[in-house]
Amino acid sequence: MLLCLTALYAQRADNYPPTKNAQVKLSETNLPIVFIDVDGKMILREERITAKIKIIDNGTGKTNYADLAAHPDQKVDYEGYISLKYRGNSSFNSSDKKPYGFKTIAKPLEEGGKKVKVSLLGLGKDNDWVLLAPFSDKTMIRDVLTFELGRPYLDWVPSLRHVEVVVDGKYYGIYILTERPGKGKNRLNLHDPGEDGGDLTGDWRVEIDRDDEDHYYRSKYHPYGRYGTVDNTKYIIYQYDDPEYEDFADLPAGTEKAIQKSIDDMEDCFAGDNYKDPVNGYRKYIDVTSFIDYMLSTEFTFNVDGYRLSSHMYKYSETRAKNEGLDSRWKCTLWDFNIALGNADYYKGSRTDLWQYDMNSRETDNQLVPFWWKRLIDDPAYQTDLKARWAQYREGQYADNRIDAKIDSLATLLTSGGAMERNEAAWGMFGRYVWPNAYVGYSFNDEISYLKRWIKSRLTFMDKKLLPQEKTDIRPVTVASGYNADVVVEALPASSHADNAVTFNRRIACNPCNHFAINTDNAIFVF
């Protein structure tokens, strides 16, 4: 009965049309248009159906028209068959607007449906695609912003494009067409395990997530709980993503055990007394820079799912590493930031002054942060590397002006051609709570302003913790007789930043003010 109810909940014959106004019409837009034709069939959660896709993209700065008959000479970026299904966990169950996963295929599924790799909207050639459906993220840019900021630093980050989607002639609003972490040459570029001379030391990807798959690997170690003690009731779950469990039968015997061993080797090291050893410690098993880059992206966004859900790790085999100049240690990539950047009202997700890696000390959940992130942060050498990397970030992509410029550019993209207005007319997101909003804005501008304020506060916190701070210059000052000064502050030069100034709620009348003192009665004395 439970399975039946779940299946019914996961699909509807009307394919979840817009809830505010299902009659919104798209005539023209600055965004690419994705037409999906399911011919009236019901889209399913667990099984794929055959559909057709056509993508119109006349190029940057050009208008795309929804009336194909009236505008027959438009550029068709791609047209063909796809195998389509719903995707996502919380993004599906808690959202009126449903995300899709699809694969490009040469023929309908009923005729074999062989996969075909294509490039969509300039993204890397592959056959596995996602249409994210931003709903709780009312800015619709949190994933895009995080990926674009992190792209120069990590080895691979998904590329993505905002689009407008039409399903069976009905307008469904703004979506994000994105690559997903995968084995393809233009993704993580993984071979089949054993493909390189039978080497079973890598070329796989695992995902730290829930135990909601039929097959997964449960770590022999437990995460830390509150008070820094190990919580033996909680587990670290590794899902098999590339290859999937179903693929093991067609791969060399022992592939699953080899994946488990590579996880064990890393975790055994972290659990050992000498894990900080620069040669034989954890640096032997993980690409430290990759883990730092993942950590900084996760902490900058204060992603409440970070480290413990949708956390992707991959590695190449030692043979490939030797032959192709790769690194065979575990690496990280990015995925799923729609409820990050102050967009969660649980686990203190709106706070800007906490660390996500330390979540286990504050919260209780079935999926906690793996123990080895705390082991990393407990290593002074790792902290030194982390701080140095953050300094590079702040001088590069994460500079205040660059972050603001990226946000403004994305906001303009979504508003200049009316896409945001149409999406709001269809779905009615603003002015109401959508799980798990920590902030409810009444307009797109409200949401963008909140995002900017939150980021500014988060950067201030991280800079204070990770960057060298200017030391206060304390020198003796003579205080007039009769005053017992608790604090003496020298007047700041005119060039000092206002953020560093000391302010009081009463005006000081003097010109110039060289020094002032505050006595035990809170009286201000200027001299």
Q: For each of these PLM feature ranges, what is it?
A:
Residues 69-133, 255:
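Conserved oxyanion/phosphate-binding beta-strand-loop segments in alpha/beta enzyme cores
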Residues 100-103, 127-133, 140, 148, ...:
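Structural recognition of the beta-strand scaffold that forms the well-ordered cores
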Residues 30-32, 42-44, 48-49, 91, ...:
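Middle-to-C-terminal accessory/interaction subdomains
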Residues 2-10:
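Hydrophobic h-region of N-terminal signal peptides that target proteins for export
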Residues 469-516, 523, 527:
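Secondary-structure capping and domain/repeat boundary segments
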Residues 106-109, 123-134, 153-158, 170-296, ...:
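Internal "kinase-insert"/substrate-recognition segments embedded within catalytic cores
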Residues 11-73:
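N-terminal module-boundary/linker segments of secreted carbohydrate-active enzymes
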